[in-house]
UniProtKB/Swiss-Prot annotation:
Keywords: ATP-binding, Cell cycle, Cell division, Centromere, Chromosome, Cytoplasm, Cytoskeleton, Dynein, Endosome, Host-virus interaction, Kinetochore, Membrane, Microtubule, Mitosis, Motor protein, Nucleotide-binding, Phosphoprotein, Transport. Residues 1-25, 387-434, 456-523 are annotated as: Disordered. Disulfide bonds: none annotated. This is Cytoplasmic dynein 1 light intermediate chain 1. One of its GO terms (cellular component) is cytoplasmic dynein complex. Homodimer. The cytoplasmic dynein 1 complex consists of two catalytic heavy chains (HCs) and a number of non-catalytic subunits presented by intermediate chains (ICs), light intermediate chains (LICs) and light chains (LCs); the composition seems to vary in respect to the IC, LIC and LC composition. The heavy chain homodimer serves as a scaffold for the probable homodimeric assembly of the respective non-catalytic subunits. The ICs and LICs bind directly to the HC dimer and the LCs assemble on the IC dimer. Self-associates. (Microbial infection) Interacts with human adenovirus 5 hexon protein; this interaction probably allows virus intracellular transport. ATP binds at residues 74-81. It comes from Homo sapiens. One of its GO terms (biological process) is cell division. PANTHER family: CYTOPLASMIC DYNEIN 1 LIGHT INTERMEDIATE CHAIN 1, DYNEIN LIGHT INTERMEDIATE CHAIN. The modification Phosphothreonine is found at residues 213, 408, 512-513, 515. Residues 9-19, 412-421, 506-523 have a biased composition (Low complexity). The lineage of its organism: Eukaryota, Metazoa, Chordata, Craniata, Vertebrata.
Length: 523
């Protein structure tokens, strides 16, 4: 009978268990038949079952829910898979195709409970948007967080990418045909969460935080501020998180594309305006520098599982911005506009943040150093093909002797032409390797120098005829040729006469004996 009573007690609700057990017929029978000892044992058993039922009920309410989802959308190469793999702590991975599935382990340290959060990554090609039906349906919509990923290394694509993928989500949600009442509740919940955001301050409790398991009805009806004119104008009914990846490229944009602080403030202001329209949060991350990766995970579990976080908004660091949903407004965005110098807040995003011109990089051909022996063999073959050349200048082998050089020595001249003394043997000889033109000039120069430097008509000199009329006419007192009587004028006349003689009578030389004229004159 006692066993039957305990089974019945297990099936009843915990609040009514003690009254049913003690006041019912079974309780009266036990109290009257078995005495006080049996009644005391059954009372202890009742208290045990009450504790067990109470603990089970508490655990069922505080247990981490299953079936939560995160949907990532963005362009190809934006870093969607890299971001989730970094959160998981996996360094090496392979990128999926179409619709990729991953998961995040969620652990509640306070309750020692854990679960898995489903992660769906849609391909950057719009061709695959039909696969959203497997990750986002009417049942899982209210348990889903949408993450829009933007590549900050290409900021000129940021705004178009956000608008494109947000419209894809809106189009898919409209196709789900959610009942209007349910959709209205989801939208109101998102508005309520946005309005009730409280920024963590210094007075934030430092004790270990527990998940917020209170229902909406348990919350007090506190007065909230109305939404701004541009806030939640595109309410999807589900939380949205905008993640800007590759923020380490900001320094590259400054160096290579001349971006300044006002450009980054301009980009941030437009992204924050977009986030206001969808009630989204904004986080700047960098997988390369491991910046704000943990913050993304904390924000996900806070939105889906109610985990608290104590991280305030960050807007000072341009590469580590964090703006939770509900913190931002138009006035705070206007603070960025105060730093504009050459830009204006009303400028179009596409006119200011433009795609830089594509630079054609000319890749120089890499020069590979070949083996020394191979190089020497090639060099030897090239040298073998070339004809041998003389070490000096080519020798002029023609039998032509430079014109104007006298060949016949000791010739008699007329009385009015002075005799020419031969060039001494010690004079400079002409190099036979010199060209013909250079040789002729050298011979003439030596010839004229000898005429000007030597005294012509010396006593007993060759080439003077004793019986010439000029000798008789000159008188016998001096015994000198007439050319020596006027030393200042006569040699000049002799030079002209000699030149006339040279031009009238060319000299020929045997080809076998290319002897220089100076040597012939000296012989």
């Amino acid at each position: 009978m006692a066993a039957v009573g305990r089974v019945g007690s297990f099936g009843s609700s915990p609040p009514g268990l003690s009254s049913t057990y003690t006041g019912g017929p079974l309780g009266n029978e036990i109290a009257s038949g078995n005495g006080g000892a049996a009644a005391g044992d059954d009372e202890d058993g009742q208290n045990l079952w009450s504790c067990i039922l109470s603990e089970v009920s508490t655990r069922s309410r505080s247990k981490l829910p299953a079936g939560k989802n995160v949907l990532l959308l963005g362009e190809d190469g934006a870093g969607k898979t890299s971001l989730i793999r970094k959160i998981q702590g996996i360094e090496e991975y392979k990128k999926g195709r179409g619709l990729e599935y991953l998961y995040l382990n969620v652990h509640d340290e306070d309750r020692d409970d854990q679960t898995r959060c489903n992660v769906w990554i849609l391909d950057g090609d719009l061709y695959h948007k039909g696969l959203l039906k497997f990750s986002l349906d009417a049942v899982s919509l209210k348990d889903t967080l949408v993450m829009l990923v933007v590549d900050m290394s290409k900021p000129w694509t940021a705004l178009d990418s956000l608008q494109k993928w947000a419209s894809v989500v809106r189009e898919h949600v409209d196709k789900l045909k959610i009942p209007p009442e349910e959709m209205k509740q989801m939208e109101q919940k998102l508005i309520r969460d946005f309005q009730e955001y409280v920024e963590p301050g210094e007075d934030f409790p430092a004790s270990p935080q527990r998940r917020n398991t209170a229902s909406q009805e348990d919350k007090d009806d506190s007065v909230v501020l109305p939404l701004g004119a541009d806030t939640l104008t595109h309410n999807l009914g589900i939380p949205v998180l905008v993640v800007c990846t590759k923020c380490d490229a900001i320094s590259v944009l400054e160096k290579e594309h001349d971006y300044r602080d006002e450009h980054f403030d301009f980009i941030q202001s437009h992204i924050r305006k977009f986030c206001l329209q969808y009630g989204a949060a904004l986080i700047y991350t960098s997988v390369k520098e491991n910046k704000n990766i943990d913050l993304v995970y904390k924000y996900i579990v806070q939105k889906l599982y109610g985990f608290p976080y104590k991280i305030p908004a960050v807007v000072v660091e341009k590469d580590a911005v964090f703006i939770p949903a509900g913190w931002d407004n138009d006035k705070k965005i206007g603070i960025l506009h105060e730093n504009f110098q050459t830009l204006k807040a009303e400028d179009n995003f596409e006119d200011i943040i433009t795609k830089p011109p594509v630079r054609k990089f000319v890749h120089e051909k890499e020069i590979m150093a070949e083996d020394d022996q191979v190089f020497l063999m090639k060099l030897q073959s090239l040298l073998a093909k070339q004809p041998p050349t003389a070490a000096g200048r080519p020798v002029d082998a023609s039998p032509r002797v430079p014109g104007g050089s006298p060949r016949t020595p000791n010739r008699s001249v007329s009385s009015n032409v002075a005799s020419v003394s031969p060039i001494p043997a010690g004079s400079k000889k002409i190099d036979p390797n010199m060209k013909a033109g250079a040789t002729s000039e050298g011979v003439l120069a030596n010839f004229f120098n000898s005429l000007l430097s030597k005294k012509t008509g010396s006593p007993g000199g060759p080439g003077v005829s004793g019986g010439s009329p000029a000798g008789g006419a000159g008188g016998g007192s001096s015994g000198l040729p007439p050319s020596t009587k006027k030393s200042g004028q006569k040699p000049v006349l002799d030079v002209h006469a000699e030149l006339d003689r040279i031009t009238r009578k060319p000299v020929t030389v045997s080809p076998t004996t290319p002897t220089s004229p100076t040597e012939g004159e000296a012989s």
